[in-house]
Amino acid sequence: MSIIGIGTDIIEIFRIKNIVYNFKDKLAERILSVQELEKYKVNKNPIKFLAKRFAVKEAASKALGTGISYGIKFNQIELYNNNLGKPKLRFLKYALQKSEEMKCKSIFVSISDEKLYACALVILEK
């Protein structure tokens, strides 16, 4: 296996809090997949939930080599957890097409948050 993409991102949680305060669920509806949106609506800490997903999606788009542009949208990158709680990524639509073009076989994701920040690292391998 060899690394074909690396992306990282850090976001100030307060920034997400301000956006949610001013625009309600507009950001969540824009960046989350249908499954993520369902979890967001019942999450005990929706601001951190949203901040972590924002960071992961930015990091994943950077690992794909495009950033959020060139047809890749936030809701085409889906974060979920396996039965042990390990974070996993699923690419949809154009993000999936891009990962297939890169011959991506494995996706590694790490997420962390503290009081002020959420950060993520995504590594793609072929």
UniProtKB/Swiss-Prot annotation:
Major location (coarse): cytoplasm
Source organism (scientific name): Buchnera aphidicola subsp. Schizaphis graminum (strain Sg)
Function: Transfers the 4'-phosphopantetheine moiety from coenzyme A to a Ser of acyl-carrier-protein.
Official protein name in the record: Holo-[acyl-carrier-protein] synthase
Cofactor: Mg(2+)
Enzyme class: transferase
EC assignment: 2.7.8.7
Binding site for Mg(2+): D9, E58
Species classification: Bacteria, Pseudomonadati, Pseudomonadota, Gammaproteobacteria, Enterobacterales
Single GO MF descriptor: magnesium ion binding
The family this protein is said to belong to: Belongs to the P-Pant transferase superfamily. AcpS family.
Reactions that this protein is recorded to catalyse: apo-[ACP] + CoA = holo-[ACP] + adenosine 3',5'-bisphosphate + H(+)
GO cellular component: cytoplasm
Gene name for this UniProt entry: acpS
Keywords for this protein: Cytoplasm, Fatty acid biosynthesis, Fatty acid metabolism, Lipid biosynthesis, Lipid metabolism, Magnesium, Metal-binding, Transferase
